[in-house]
């Protein structure tokens, strides 16, 4: 089977969660299914295309369309405009689209749906993203897909209950984590990476883009109450790119009585993340809603105790290997921080949760993601072929 995959997300200047998924899925698919040919499609200006990673597998071919994405967008929207497969040297059997992106095709395709945050919490989505979804026609492309790849049971449930997508059309393809990169064992380079950010003692870590949905305000408020109530004098380290509507967050930090202990590192290279996870006493992630929650899984793989939300997909990821809280109740954050740093019993709890988290994270790897994806393609393309006989 010749499988075309849209890898335009890999041309972003900074790797996003969708980019991490796309990169690892392609790599795992090529290794798992050498009998299939994978044709990767990307578009953009020459400088943009240079950001693409190198894929070494012999069953991978990359098609680079040297055309600005805005121009491609307009071409695809034109009545009678080109189909994406017209830019490929050979006609594929099926497409995989790893996100809601503008495309036009006459071929069967599988669409990965990460979450429905834009519909469930529209107040947490930028106007630009809402406009993008409108132009893409997210309902229509979902309806017309041969199959839907949902990254969690939670996302699958949202698709069924909110959009009426038939259960038989949905396959659960959970994301994975690189067990070689994200592991509990301290690495020789860890201290040097942490020293880059002047992190020479334990800390509380929160890693997320600064945007409303990530609920970092509750991290700040919870930390301040925790410290005011006599909690351990651990600094709070915030890692993540600037998003949007950060004014309230910045104001909370500036007003905090403990602002000198709140460190904003901004965006950091991916290769530094494992060292920062491993140096943390606890990882805090009280997001309001997640389709999956990859940073939580990464922290777990590094053996870090996790405090996260008892909402959406996060209980699926964490199970009993972390502390689940109500993201709408800041006192839950405070209570969990006290529980996990408590002088007498906290150390035992951290050791227990860290070991459980590391063990549970082993259930999530990119090979499993690829296996579930291939199974979905085989099942639904076979069903379609039989139906056409």
Descriptions of predicted regions:
Residues 1-389:
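Carbohydrate transferase catalytic cores enriched for Leloir-type hexosyltransferases
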């Amino acid at each position: 089977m010749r499988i075309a995959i849209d890898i335009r997300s890999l041309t972003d200047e900074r790797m996003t969660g969708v980019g991490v998924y796309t990169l690892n899925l392609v790599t795992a698919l090529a290794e798992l299914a050498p009998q299939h040919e994978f044709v990767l499609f990307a578009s953009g200006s020459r400088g943009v295309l240079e950001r693409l990673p190198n894929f070494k597998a012999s069953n991978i071919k990359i098609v680079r369309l040297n055309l600005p994405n805005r121009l491609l967008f307009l071409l695809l929207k034109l009545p009678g405009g080109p189909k994406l497969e017209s830019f490929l040297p050979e006609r594929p059997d099926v497409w995989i689209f790893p996100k809601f992106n503008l495309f036009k095709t006459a071929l069967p395709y599988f669409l990965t749906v990460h979450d429905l945050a834009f519909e469930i919490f529209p107040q947490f989505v930028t106007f630009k993203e809402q406009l993008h979804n409108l132009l893409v026609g997210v309902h229509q492309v979902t309806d017309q897909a041969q199959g839907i790849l949902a990254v969690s049971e939670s996302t699958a449930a949202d698709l069924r209950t909110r959009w009426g997508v038939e259960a038989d059309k949905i396959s659960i393809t959970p994301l994975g984590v690189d067990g070689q990169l994200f592991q509990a064992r301290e690495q020789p380079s860890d201290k040097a990476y942490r020293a880059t950010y002047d992190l020479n003692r334990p800390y509380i870590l929160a890693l997320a883009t600064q945007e409303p949905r990530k609920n970092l305000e509750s991290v700040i408020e919870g930390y301040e109450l925790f410290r005011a109530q006599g909690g351990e004098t651990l600094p709070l380290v915030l890692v993540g790119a600037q998003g949007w509507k950060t004014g309230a967050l910045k104001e909370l930090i500036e007003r905090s009585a403990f602002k000198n202990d709140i460190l904003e590192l901004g965006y950091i290279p991916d290769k530094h993340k494992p060292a920062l996870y491993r140096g943390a006493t606890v990882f805090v992630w009280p997001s309001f809603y997640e389709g999956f929650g990859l940073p939580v899984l990464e922290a777990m793989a590094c053996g870090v105790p996790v405090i996260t939300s008892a909402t959406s997909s996060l209980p699926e990821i964490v199970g009993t290997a972390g502390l689940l809280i109500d993201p709408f109740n800041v006192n839950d954050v405070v209570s969990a921080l006290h529980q996990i740093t408590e002088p007498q019993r906290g150390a035992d709890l951290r050791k227990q949760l860290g070991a459980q988290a590391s063990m549970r994270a082993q259930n999530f790897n990119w090979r499993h993601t690829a296996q579930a994806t291939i199974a979905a393609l085989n099942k639904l393309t076979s069903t379609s072929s039989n139906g056409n006989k």
